[in-house]
């Protein structure tokens, strides 16, 4: 057996190999390698080996993964140690040798099954000797790998960067949320493969399409099982905990082990970020994408109905879906060999409720190009995703007698400002052009007409275009409001009514404000006002109204938006005019001052300031600072109360330990709000060597 060669030990050269395979952030002790790329091990012998060629002919290596390794399903491979090797299959070549050791280069196939492997040595068919374990990952640097990404800057961003930005807010007030993907945290690789192991088709782990769909489905299932309803009331400390949303790793730990940070229903958008972490960890380039004004739950229909009462307030839930203020999704990069040519590149992970098709049946993988072109027959989810960014909204008025009346509402454009973090920077990149042709363009018209025709033929669904409205006595309504409103602040809104007819009109105007969650679900009714106006013939009238937090029936729940609506009705027509604006609630600005460049192992100081722009004191203030490569562990500091118009200032000193672009994240929690964050990036350079 192995003792015939007198094997003393095997050095897997983890630090060196991990450096060459872009996995050094995972570990310097455990071996993590990427498929299709050689890695080096060193065999040490107990006694000198004089006859090299005879000894070489007697030995072979076996690499195996999974619970039941098999050569048939490509989870086990036995291959000789030679002087040539086969770069297309498992191979091993002696690169250097002496009497005491052999340096062996092992190459894995570019389409090998990923996962935890055991490497064994076999001598002359006798019992195998375990040399050690390694983990094999996808390889975006290898042209033969299905996840190959040729741009180095994109590989650095979509695979190696742990500091992310996720875009929340509204289409008119996009807010960047600092996010720690943490794909190289110590236990993330094991948690990810543990999750993947629930799929017993290990032989298909060589296919990134299969792996992505399995992970998307399992994470969606975990989210549905683990996401908790947000309590209506909670103490300040509990509220601060509920709204923590700094990164993927605590969430992944909670979902898989029950230990970590819980997620509540108002934050279920984090699924896209957790999926991005797991995909990047396994070697699949991925990014989080946000679509503003996204039509969800339409069943692929290109019409979405919204219902409002006579006061202009949203009347419960739509029968067929609703428009989300924003919706996050995960894109991953890979080839699609099973699809027609032209659908390689970015794919959208689209999990859904299980429909009897097993794990894969509850997560589709949709080429972005298929959504843009409206290729409905390519894969089932194209229809849903196309509708999400192209549907038309129809607004109905629910009358007191139970009848529904169609309103004349301005077209709500869905699928706006589709955004993701820019490559190598903190800027917001608009990628709407990847998903749809320009609004009003000939290409957009052609795609929509083709999709409408196909839907009517396939589904016999006439609900494609909004119902036409005709009125002999038109009234026009225009609503203007700021894109954001300071927390506990005030603003001016204006309503413009235009009477183009030759007759005077008696108009009833209803204006309302509601708090809504990001997914369009009503959270609270806050304020309403009714006006009775007389509008002269051929006249335009502008009504200006103050919007004050102090007039609201209650404070808007944390992490909600204001939905401002206006509905105008006149006596000569049953047709009401309707307009709506979504307003982001902005909290006080958290300012961070810090040098743009710092030296490794040299103290660095950051200054943090927060002015209380509210009308009440900020009490129970806690500042937390964190940053991988800058601060070993999160630090938290308690501060005194900050009175209105006063400013809280603090300085923090820490010592950077990692070279490269690092990010400091600062968070403030108090009785008035939780999870107020900001971030600042710093480039850490290695110390100059003294002459």
UniProtKB/Swiss-Prot annotation:
Its main location: membrane. The keyword Cell membrane applies. It is found in: Cell membrane; Cytoplasm, Cytoskeleton. It is a lipid-anchor. Residues 31-39 are annotated as: Band 3 binding. Component of the ankyrin-1 complex in the erythrocyte, composed of ANK1, RHCE, RHAG, SLC4A1, EPB42, GYPA, GYPB and AQP1. Interacts with SLC4A1 (via the cytoplasmic domain); this interaction is mediated by the SLC4A1 Band 3-I dimer. Interacts with ANK1 (via ANK 1-13 repeats). Interacts with AQP1 (via the C-terminal). Belongs to the transglutaminase superfamily. Transglutaminase family. Keywords: Cell membrane, Cell shape, Cytoplasm, Cytoskeleton, Disease variant, Erythrocyte maturation, Hereditary hemolytic anemia, Lipoprotein, Membrane, Myristate, Phosphoprotein. It comes from Homo sapiens (Human). A lipid is attached at residue 2 (N-myristoyl glycine). This is Protein 4.2. It is linked to Spherocytosis 5: Spherocytosis is a hematologic disorder leading to chronic hemolytic anemia and characterized by numerous abnormally shaped erythrocytes which are generally spheroidal. Absence of band 4.2 associated with spur or target erythrocytes has also been reported. Component of the ankyrin-1 complex, a multiprotein complex involved in the stability and shape of the erythrocyte membrane. GO terms for biological process: cell morphogenesis; erythrocyte maturation; hemoglobin metabolic process; multicellular organismal-level iron ion homeostasis; regulation of cell shape; spleen development. The substitution of an Ala for a Cys in the active site may be responsible for the lack of transglutaminase activity of band 4.2. The modification Phosphoserine is found at residue 248. One of its GO terms (molecular function) is ATP binding. The lineage of its organism: Eukaryota, Metazoa, Chordata, Craniata, Vertebrata. GO terms for cellular component: ankyrin-1 complex; cortical cytoskeleton; cytoskeleton; plasma membrane. Disulfide bonds: none annotated. Both cAMP-dependent kinase (CAPK) and another kinase present in the red-blood cells seem to be able to phosphorylate EPB42.
């Amino acid at each position: 057996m192995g003792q015939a060669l007198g094997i003393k030990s095997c050095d897997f050269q983890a630090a060196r190999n991990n450096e060459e395979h872009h996995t050094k952030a995972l570990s310097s002790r455990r071996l993590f390698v990427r498929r299709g790329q050689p890695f080096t091990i060193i065999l040490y012998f107990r006694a000198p080996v004089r006859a090299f060629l005879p000894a070489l002919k007697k030995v072979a290596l076996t690499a195996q993964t999974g619970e039941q390794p098999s050569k048939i399903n490509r989870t086990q491979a036995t291959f000789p140690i030679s002087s040539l090797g086969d770069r297309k299959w498992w191979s091993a070549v002696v690169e250097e040798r002496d009497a005491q050791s052999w340096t062996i280069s092992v190459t894995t196939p570019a389409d090998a099954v990923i996962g935890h492997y055991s490497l064994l040595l076999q001598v002359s068919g006798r019992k195998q000797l375990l040399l050690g374990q390694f983990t094999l990952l996808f390889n975006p640097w290898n042209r033969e790998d299905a996840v190959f990404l040729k741009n180095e800057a994109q590989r650095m961003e979509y695979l190696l960067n742990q500091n992310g930005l996720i875009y929340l807010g509204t289409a008119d007030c996009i807010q960047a949320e600092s996010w720690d993907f943490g794909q190289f945290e110590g236990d993330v690789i094991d948690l990810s493969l543990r999750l993947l192991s629930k799929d017993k088709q290990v032989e298909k782990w060589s296919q990134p399409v299969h792996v992505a769909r399995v992970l998307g489905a399992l994470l969606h299932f975990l989210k549905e099982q683990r996401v908790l309803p947000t309590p209506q009331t909670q103490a300040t400390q509990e509220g601060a905990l509920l709204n923590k949303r700094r990164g993927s790793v605590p969430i992944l730990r909670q979902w898989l082990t029950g230990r970590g940070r819980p997620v509540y229903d108002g934050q279920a958008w984090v699924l896209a970020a957790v999926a991005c972490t797991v995909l990047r960890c396994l070697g699949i380039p991925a990014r989080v994408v946000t679509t503003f004004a996204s039509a969800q739950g339409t069943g692929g229909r290109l019409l979405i109905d919204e219902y409002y009462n006579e006061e202009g307030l949203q009347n419960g839930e739509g029968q067929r879906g609703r428009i989300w203020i924003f919706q996050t999704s995960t894109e991953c990069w890979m080839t699609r060999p099973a699809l027609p040519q032209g659908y390689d590149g970015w794919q959208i992970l689209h999990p859904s409720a299980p429909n009897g098709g097993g794990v894969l049946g509850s997560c589709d993988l949709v080429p972005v190009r298929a959504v843009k072109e409206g290729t409905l027959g390519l894969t089932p989810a194209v229809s849903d995703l196309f509708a999400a960014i192209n549907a038309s909204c129809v607004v109905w008025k629910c009358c007191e007698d139970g009848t529904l009346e169609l309103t004349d509402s301005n077209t709500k454009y869905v699928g706006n400002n589709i955004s993701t973090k820019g490559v190598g920077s903190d800027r917001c990149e608009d990628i709407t052009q990847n998903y749809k042709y320009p609004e009003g363009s000939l290409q957009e018209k052609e795609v929509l007409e083709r999709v409408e025709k196909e839907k009517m033929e396939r589904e016999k669904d006439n609900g494609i275009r909004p119902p036409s409205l005709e009125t002999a006595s038109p009234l026009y309504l225009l609503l203007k409001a700021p894109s954001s409103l300071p927390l506990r602040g005030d603003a001016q809104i204006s309503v413009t009514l235009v009477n183009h007819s030759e007759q005077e009109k008696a108009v009833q105007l209803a204006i309302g404000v509601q708090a809504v969650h990001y997914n369009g679900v009503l959270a609270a009714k806050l304020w309403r006002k009714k006006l009775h106006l007389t509008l002269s013939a051929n006249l335009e009238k502008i009504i200006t109204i103050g919007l004050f937090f102090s007039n609201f029936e209650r404070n808007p729940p944390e992490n909600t938006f204001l939905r401002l609506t206006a509905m105008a009705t006149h006596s000569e027509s049953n047709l009401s005019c309707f307009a709506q604006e979504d307003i982001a609630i902005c909290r006080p600005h958290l300012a961070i001052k810090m040098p743009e460049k710092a030296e490794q192992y040299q103290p660095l100081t950051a200054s943090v300031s927060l002015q209380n722009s509210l009308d009440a004191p900020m009490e129970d203030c806690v500042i937390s600072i964190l940053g991988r490569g800058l601060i070993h562990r999160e630090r938290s500091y308690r501060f005194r109360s900050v009175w209105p118009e006063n400013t809280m200032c603090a300085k923090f000193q820490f010592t950077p330990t990692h070279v490269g672009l690092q990010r400091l994240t600062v968070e403030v929690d108090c009785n008035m709000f939780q999870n107020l964050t900001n971030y600042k990036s710093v480039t850490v350079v290695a110390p100059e060597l003294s002459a």
